Amino acid sequence: RLGKLPIIAEDLGLLTERVKKLLKRSGFPGMKVLEFAFDSEDSDYLPHKYEENCVAYTGTHDNNTVTGWYETISPETKNYCDEYLKKYLSKFESDYWLPINLRFIDAIWASKANIVIAQMQDFIGLGENGRMNAPSTLGKNWKWRLNEKYITDELCNGIKMVTRKFKR
């Protein structure tokens, strides 16, 4: 906290040891974005590496939705993502055959992160058409709105079930 203001450090991208030490000293939680996790096996964005003092996200407003991301990644990245999630989620008796958006939500909800956040577009399973923002572009940014048709008993029960399952 900074006074009464809660602070989340945007510690994304290349982090030097100096920056990591500064963040640790500050006590502010950092960010863990699961979409960033699958470029290497030692990625700090893999959920089994999350510490409690962090905020875990499926993706951010500047990323594609999970479904949109998954549709555009390379076959190698997709294979690594699938294999990692299968192994990681098996510890929590999660259904590996869920759609990718729900596996991502299960993965961060199961993590040690004190706070977990998923965009509504990821709960719904929208693809590229649900993207909130594409940095350095004009036109369609920040126009997505939750349409009433998506607010279903199935969606509400799904959110309730994952929240209860992982005691969030």
Regions found by a protein language model. Give the residues of each.
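Catalytic cores of glycan-processing enzymes that make or break glycosidic bonds
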Residues: R1-R168
